[in-house]
């Protein structure tokens, strides 16, 4: 059970809307009969939109869970704009029929929350990640890995709700936010994370594993030390080459003289 939200069936953000729709539908039914049908349709739609069912949560410590229901629209290597590092980016688009409650993808500690004002273009488009209103949660997992998950407003969604803050500890599957009426969530994971989904896959919040993230970062191999240069033994040369040459010439002269003496005899 989520410690921040003990009623998992209907999201608390929908209680005023559902309650108002139900009261209005009953009132119109008593006064106008069948003319109340549109009000009942709206109330039923609100019930399904704000549903927030409990889900089974995988406990593999390497599993990064989908924070929301939806469809995968991006799986690529990209730049995490909040940490300025290369990352594996996975984006999930939510239509109005998906559960819009956002939950933590891993056991983590929130290090920073960054809110950016922006536009409200279709959240299915890539430019929504950089142009739309968005709220980023930067966190460090229990094993020390850094991840970023971003709530992105959509064409209809006009309000991002985030209930966490720097220093807060989130358990995997714990509810931390909500976006109304169609939106998107961008995930930025370390580059050594292994994606478990592809574009077009439909995912279920906290039940689908988006990626597997090793508990420790890969070790950067250091360059091998260069071998010391072999020292060449110095070549000894004659201390006085001219004197040696004179000795050779003198010996040659003696030999020549001896040969001449032999020939004379």
UniProtKB/Swiss-Prot annotation:
One Pfam family cited in the UniProt record for this chain: PS_Dcarbxylase
EC number: 4.1.1.65
Pathway: Phospholipid metabolism; phosphatidylethanolamine biosynthesis; phosphatidylethanolamine from CDP-diacylglycerol: step 2/2
Catalytic activity line of the entry: a 1,2-diacyl-sn-glycero-3-phospho-L-serine + H(+) = a 1,2-diacyl-sn-glycero-3-phosphoethanolamine + CO2
Broad enzyme group: lyase
InterPro entries: PS_Dcarbxylase, PSD-A
One GO MF term attached to the UniProt entry: phosphatidylserine decarboxylase activity
Residues recorded as bearing Pyruvic acid (Ser) in the entry: 183
Membrane topology: Peripheral membrane protein
GO BP term (any one): phosphatidylethanolamine biosynthetic process
Subcellular location: Cell membrane
Active site (record annotation): 183
Highest taxon in the source lineage: Bacteria
Any single GO CC term annotated in Swiss-Prot or TrEMBL for this entry: plasma membrane
Stored NCBIfam families: AS_decarb, PRK05305.1-2, PRK05305.1-5
Subunit (UniProt): Heterodimer of a large membrane-associated beta subunit and a small pyruvoyl-containing alpha subunit.
Job of this protein: Catalyzes the formation of phosphatidylethanolamine (PtdEtn) from phosphatidylserine (PtdSer).
Name recorded for this polypeptide: Phosphatidylserine decarboxylase proenzyme
Species assigned in the record: Neisseria meningitidis serogroup C / serotype 2a (strain ATCC 700532 / DSM 15464 / FAM18)
Organismal lineage: Bacteria, Pseudomonadati, Pseudomonadota, Betaproteobacteria, Neisseriales
Gene encoding the protein: psd
